[in-house]
Amino acid sequence: SLGVDWSTTAHGDLDLDDGEINHADLDEEFWTALPVLEHIRTAARSRRTAPTAVLGSVLARASALIPPSTCVPPFVGGTVPLSIIVALVATTGGSKSATDRVAADILTNTPPGVGGPFALGSGEGAAEAYLERYTAKDDNGKNVNRQRQIKYGVIFTLDEGRVLTELGSRSGSTIVPTLCTMWTGGDPGRMNASAETRRTLP
């Protein structure tokens, strides 16, 4: 389950009902190290959102723009793509969605081959987001369903952590295992017998 006890997402070890959540922000040396980091911090502050949270959202969106052929070297095991999962933690009304909107305004250009943001719904739907279905003719001239991958990167979002908990707890749900597989660069699809339900990603 991504190494997280999802049953605690509503409150967990954070006492959200008693006072403020204490968190350490990144220091001044970090934010002034690169112009792009200063830009992110300035944009976040101008919209009254947390710079560190906006940085996380920017990184999540940026990772979808990087082709999967760009990988982390095989320090342990094999190579893995630069996929990232970011969880913004705050009380209800804590500007989580606003934070992501700031990130969207920072990264405004979505190149061909990148989709989203799409709301997560199911593991099968996550794999389907990369594909296009079309009809072709086989050797006998009969119409057959085919698929092809048209996206190399997709941005997925989920406004509330408890929604992922509910989705993952449903009988037969594949959403959490699929996220883990996609995060590590595996194929989240299924080689089913029926062409209508077959999903494979190279």
Predicted regions and their residues:
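Phosphate-handling catalytic cores of nucleic-acid transaction enzymes
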Residues: 2-202
